[in-house]
Each structure stands twice: as C-alpha cells, then as structure tokens.
C-alpha cells in the first residue's frame, strides 16, 4: 500500500510554485519533507537523540547539506567516483541554515540533533541553497523535537530596481543585490549577502521584501503540519537548577563584576579580574557542594557576568574596554610589509590583527568550481586562516574549519565587485589572523584592500568593514561599533557591514533575540556607515591610491587576441613551440579559446621576455595582404632563389623565386641580391601550382618596354 502523501504549495507570485510534501520518504526520521520547484527536489530530514549528551552544556546541533552529483546527471570526480568531503559552497549553505536554527532550540536542550538536507534532483534555473532553510524548518515542524518557532530562508535579488525572490543564477548575473535572509514570522534572524554599493535604505527594503515572502513559506509549513498531524512535543530532561545557588552567586559577584566592567581594561587584565571574582565565589561553597553543583556555580557566574556587563553598557554607555558605544579602537596599518610577495598589508585594530597577501597569476590559477549545482571558475578568491595562537590558545590543527570558510567567503564577497572587470590577473588574497579580539573578518577586508592596492590592482574604490553589536533589555538599547569578542558573546546581535564611500558591498547579520525592530536595524546601519567611513579614511591615509604598476618582482601580464586558426601554430606539435618559447623567454603562456578566437595570456617578470613572446606571436599570426608591398631581408641564398623574412615580423619567412627577382632573365641569384640585402616585395598570395606563398621583387620594378621583332 502506498502511504498517503501530504502536500502544500507556495506561490512565489511570478508563475513559480514551491511544494512541500511529506508522508512517503524517510519515515523513520523524526521529521522529513521533500521540497520541489521546477525539476529541483530537496530531501530534508531531522533526527534527535532521546537523551542529552552527558557532560555538555550546549546544543550539539549538526546541519549537513549535500548536493548529489546524480542530481545533475553527472559522475563525481576523483579516483573513487564517490561524493566525499563537502565543498565550500555546501559548507556555506550549512552555516546559513545552522545560524538561523540554533538560537530557536530551548537553551537547556542538550540532546544531539542532526539536520540533513540533500539535493536529489537539480534544475539549472533554481539555486537550491535558497530552499535549504525551508526544508530544515519544515522537517522540524513535523517532528516532536522542541523548537521555539518555525523559520524559512529566501534569496533576494534586484534587477533594474525591481526585487526578485529566489532568482536564478542567470538573473543574479544582472542583479545588484544577492542576499539570503532567514526569519520567523515576527523577526529577522539572519542576513548575509553581497551588493554593488547600495545604500542602507535599499538594504532594509530588500530585507523587508524577503520577509514578506518568508511569512508565506512559514504559513505553508504550518498548514502541512496541521494536515499531517503535529506530534506532541517530546519531554526531555531539563537542566538542573537551584534558585538558592543562583541568588548566592549573584549577591557575591554582581557588584564586583559591574565595577570591573565600568572601569574599562584590556582583555587579559579584565579576564584575570573576572577569574579572581569567580574564585572568590567558589570559595563560598564547600568542596562537597562544588563536587555536586560546581557546574551550576559556573553557569550562574556566567549568567551574572553577562547581566552585569550588559547593564554597565545600558546604564552608563561604557564598554568593557572603556570605550563609548560609537568609539572605534585605535588603528594602525602598514603596506609592503613582506618584501618578496606581490602585495601585502598589515591591519591592526585594538587587539585584532590581520596580515594579508595578494598573489597575481594567469587564468590557469583560477579557482575551479565543480559542483552539481554550479560549474565555473573564480578569478578572484580569498582564503582566511585563524590559527589558535591568535587567541592565545594551543589546540590541534584539523584542517580548514567551517568558520574559516565562512569568514573568508564574506571578505571575498566584500572585495570582489571592486576588482575591475578588465583586470587581466587571477588574484588570490590570503588573510592570516595574528591576533583576535573581535571582528577578524572585517580586519581581513581592510587588510585585503590594502594588499590589493599595494600589489598594483587598480581597485574601483577601496573597501572597509566594521562589526556592530547590540545590547537591549526590551526597553533600552545600545548599538556598539567595532565589537570585542566578549561583546559578541554577551550581546544580542552581530552585524558585519562592508562598503566603499559610495555604498555597501557585503553584510552578515546574526540576531539572537526575537522582535528586533526595523528602527533598531536602521540605527545600527547608520552607525555602521559612520564607523566604516572612519576606518576607510585611515586606510586611504596609509595608501591613498593603488600603486601605478605591479612590483618589479611581481609578474606582469599582457593579453593578446589571435584568430582561432592560429592557436595550433602557436602551441606547435605536442606543445613544442609554446614550451620552447616559455623556456627561452622565462614566461608563462596560457591560451584560451573564446568565441573562435584565441585569448593569449603572457605572464613574466622580464619585459624583454614578454616582448620576445609578443614578437613570436606577431610572426606566427602575420598574414600579408595580396597586392601589398612589404620590406624583406635576405636570410638564405639558394640556387633557385632567396629565402627572405619580413623585417616587421622576424622569423616569418617566404621564398623569393629566381623568376621573380627581375624582369630580365637571371642566371645567378647573386647577380641581383645577396645575403643581408633589404628591399621591397609584393605579396602575390598562394601559387596555384605549389600552394605556397609567393612574393615578387620585379612586380615593384618598372617593366622594360617590349623589343619589336625584326622582319
């Protein structure tokens, strides 16, 4: 018997429909749905353990998003022909979903939760990452897992001033906005995206537009859950609590923490002072009490610490390090810090420091993207590294973390639209975070800008970035500029904004509270603009404009376009010509065929080597015109003529037959021309008999009068 299928539809308002269905697939999961639009099919499942994981005080949530190659009718690459570790784009989608879901579970729910979202069928007109949040939330809606409220996510674009929900990849190429928004019916929870220098007001309009569509998607989830039969929320073992212990900890610690926080101090000094207070609090309990309830003492101390620090800011407008809410930490920058790289810059803001390098190359170094939903390449990409010493820690290095992928992607999106479209280089920027106490990704944007300018990349405009925070108790609120790491953990919002003097280029926002008003978001954006323009002024004081040219030891790239039928001649049999040319000139030559033309990239540090390659290309592609005169030089003597080369393109040779030397009969070639002689010839085209090129010296000479025959 085929199980009953439950289906709900979402009208996107432009002729497209999303359907959510359940009842047939993955029924042993706590919740499962299939999301469809066009030919795209996404399976979303959620499972949670029945018991909390022992010894942890956080939510062990795992969000996994995978795109199956079969979905696009393709085979995975590699030796094993099997999907393996997730790609960067899959990791980014996992983060987008995780950041919206995580705050919505009960704070005392510590059972392991696994959300799995899989692309099972792909439609080239649909970008599946925009549907991942919908699939995850719909699966949770059908489960008995405790969950505060339903959410969904949507992508918004804008073409010619008109907003579009969930645009296709082709539409995004024309759009000046690419933002993902995650929200519940009442509140915005997450924003991330890139823009082409839009205003703060335009960004808010885009968020509001997406939110209205998200409300429709959430209503469809509610209808599906009602039709399917919403399960009763499971009971779970809640965290133990003790009001008496909390009161004792708060009474002993609150005032001391408040006084430490309002004075303002450096991170290490402040941490030591808080640790000392914690030890004083623990001393109020016996060893037996700590053995039984030590975890509660630590938990309540953290809760008291958070409350006291937040109240200092709301009461006094003072922050942990003594700054006012709008104040930015001291900044210093330096370019050309590393002597042998193509471009480098050091950016330090307070206790956060990033060292960025820029490396230039040919299209051969482009970052290749090969996933079921996207194929292509990136000629500009940025990598972000966050070593443990940057926070004074020692921990194992286990490869690139999801956080590093996410932060690097944000910085890349902030900068990429300021790279000129006609820039011939492939560019890799690497940010090494050397110190971190808040907004290291924004330090990466600033250091990345300076490293690109130092490398001689003619950026359209420099980009700066700032991380904003928020503290609110429901009645009062304080927007914080340039937040510390502690303010990120203790606050209600982490809002990163990057932009130029003309507008916003990228943003990332995570909101940890419900019901954040648009007025507060508007205030945060306005304060962020003041902050990033202040930082931008410091960047331009360090380096006002990009350096005129690349550095002497950095490669220069020259591009030439040749007819497609000459590509083979430039490469040569088995690559012989191009390999010998690269070896002889010390250059790198890359040839790409575009629209039946050959685009040749020549990369080298020696101008003479580049000129030699250009001369060779001119020689190979030189095509004389029939009837035109050209200057030639004799380079070889033969019994039946002379081999000459065009002086304009040395190496391009042609035979001048003895019969074309002069009008008079020529017995010996040397009677007319000799080695090294330079003269003009006329190009006659291909000889119909030999099919070889033919030139003539005599065709440019006056023809002697015919002798009359004697009777």
Curated annotation (Swiss-Prot):
It is found in: Cytoplasm. Residues 555-617 form the KH domain. GO terms for biological process: mRNA catabolic process; RNA processing. It catalyses: RNA(n+1) + phosphate = RNA(n) + a ribonucleoside 5'-diphosphate. SMART domains: KH, S1. Gene3D superfamilies: GHMP Kinase, N-terminal domain (3.30.230.70), K Homology domain, type 1 (3.30.1370.10), Nucleic acid-binding proteins (2.40.50.140). Its cofactor is Mg(2+). Pfam families: KH_1, PNPase, RNase_PH, RNase_PH_C, S1. Its main location: cytoplasm. Involved in mRNA degradation. Catalyzes the phosphorolysis of single-stranded polyribonucleotides processively in the 3'- to 5'-direction. PANTHER family: POLYRIBONUCLEOTIDE NUCLEOTIDYLTRANSFERASE (PTHR11252), POLYRIBONUCLEOTIDE NUCLEOTIDYLTRANSFERASE 1, MITOCHONDRIAL (PTHR11252:SF0). Residues 691-711 are annotated as: Disordered. Transmembrane segments: none annotated. Its EC number is 2.7.7.8. Belongs to the polyribonucleotide nucleotidyltransferase family. Keywords: Cytoplasm, Magnesium, Metal-binding, Nucleotidyltransferase, RNA-binding, Transferase. Residues 627-698 form the S1 motif domain. The keyword rRNA processing does not apply. It comes from Flavobacterium psychrophilum (strain ATCC 49511 / DSM 21280 / CIP 103535 / JIP02/86). GO terms for cellular component: cytosol. The keyword Secreted does not apply. GO terms for molecular function: 3'-5'-RNA exonuclease activity; magnesium ion binding; polyribonucleotide nucleotidyltransferase activity; RNA binding. This is Polyribonucleotide nucleotidyltransferase.
């Amino acid at each position: 018997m085929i199980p009953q299928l439950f289906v709900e539809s979402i009208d996107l308002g432009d002729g497209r429909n999303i359907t959510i269905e359940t009842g047939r697939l993955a029924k042993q999961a706590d919740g499962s749905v299939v999301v469809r639009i066009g030919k795209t099919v996404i399976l979303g499942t959620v499972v949670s353990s029945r018991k909390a994981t022992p010894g942890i005080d956080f939510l062990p949530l795992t969000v996994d998003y995978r795109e199956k190659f079969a979905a696009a009718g393709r085979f995975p690459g590699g030796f094993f022909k099997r999907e393996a570790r997730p790609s960067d784009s899959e990791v980014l989608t996992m983060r987008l979903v995780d950041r919206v879901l995580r705050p919505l579970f009960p704070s005392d729910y510590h059972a392991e939760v696994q959300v799995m979202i899989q692309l099972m069928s792909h439609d080239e007109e649909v970008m599946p990452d925009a549907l991942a949040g919908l699939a995850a939330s719909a699966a949770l809606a059908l489960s008995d897992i405790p969950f505060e409220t339903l959410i969904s996510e949507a992508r918004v674009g804008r073409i010619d001033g008109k907003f579009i929900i969930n645009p296709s990849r082709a539409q995004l190429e024309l759009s000046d906005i690419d933002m993902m928004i995650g929200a519940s019916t009442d509140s915005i929870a997450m924003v991330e995206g890139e823009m082409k220098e839009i205003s703060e007001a335009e960004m808010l309009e885009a968020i509001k537009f997406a939110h209205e569509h998200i409300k429709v998607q959430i209503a469809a989830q509610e209808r599906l859950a009602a039709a399917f039969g919403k399960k009763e929320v499971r009971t779970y073992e809640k965290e133990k609590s003790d009001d008496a212990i909390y009161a004792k900890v708060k009474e002993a610690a609150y005032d001391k923490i408040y006084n430490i926080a309002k004075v303002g101090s450096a991170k290490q000094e402040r941490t030591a002072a808080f640790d000392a207070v914690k030890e004083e609090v623990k001393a109020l309990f016996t060893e037996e009490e700590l053995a039984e309830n030590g975890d509660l003492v630590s938990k309540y101390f953290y809760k008291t610490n958070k409350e006291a620090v937040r109240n200092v800011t709301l009461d006094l407008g003072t922050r942990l390090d003594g700054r006012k809410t709008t104040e930015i930490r001291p900044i210093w920058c330096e370019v050309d810090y590393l002597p042998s790289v193509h471009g480098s810059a050091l950016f330090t803001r307070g206790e956060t420091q990033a060292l960025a390098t820029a490396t230039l190359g040919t299209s051969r170094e482009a970052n290749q993207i090969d996933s079921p939903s996207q194929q292509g390449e990136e000629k500009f990409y940025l990598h972000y590294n966050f070593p443990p010493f940057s926070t004074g820690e020692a921990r194992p290095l286990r490869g690139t973390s999801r956080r590093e992928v996410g932060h690097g992607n944000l910085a890349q999106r902030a900068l990429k639209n300021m790279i000129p479209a006609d820039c011939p280089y492939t560019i890799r920027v690497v940010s090494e975070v050397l110190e971190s106490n808040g907004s290291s990704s924004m330090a990466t944007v600033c250091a990345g800008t300076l490293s690109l300018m130092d490398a001689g990349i003619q950026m359209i405009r420099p980009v700066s970035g700032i991380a904003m925070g928020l503290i609110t108790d429901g009645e009062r609120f304080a927007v914080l500029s340039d937040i510390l790491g502690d303010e990120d953990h203790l606050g209600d919002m982490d809002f990163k904004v990057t932009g130029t003097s003309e507008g916003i280029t990228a943003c990332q926002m995570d909101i940890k509270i419900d019901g954040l008003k648009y007025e507060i978001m508007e205030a945060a954006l306005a304060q962020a603009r003041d902050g990033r323009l202040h930082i931008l002024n410091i960047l331009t004081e360090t380096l006002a404009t990009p350096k005129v040219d690349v550095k002497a030891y950095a490669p220069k790239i020259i591009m030439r376009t040749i007819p497609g039928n000459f590509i083979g001649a430039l490469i040569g049999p088995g690559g012989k010509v191009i390999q010998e040319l690269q070896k002889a000139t010390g250059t790198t030559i890359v040839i790409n065929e575009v629209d039946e033309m050959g685009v040749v990239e020549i990369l080298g540090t020696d101008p003479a080597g580049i000129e030699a390659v250009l001369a060779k290309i001119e020689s190979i592609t030189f095509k004389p015109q029939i009837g035109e005169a050209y200057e030639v030089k004799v380079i070889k003597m033969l019994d039946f003529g002379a081999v000459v080369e065009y002086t304009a393109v040395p190496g391009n040779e042609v035979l001048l037959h003895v019969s074309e030397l002069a009008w008079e009969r020529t017995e010996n070639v040397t009677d007319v021309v000799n080695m090294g002689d330079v003269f003009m010839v006329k190009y006659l085209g291909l000889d119909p008999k030999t099919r070889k090129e033919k030139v003539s010296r005599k065709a440019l000479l006056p023809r002697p009068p015919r002798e009359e025959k004697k009777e």
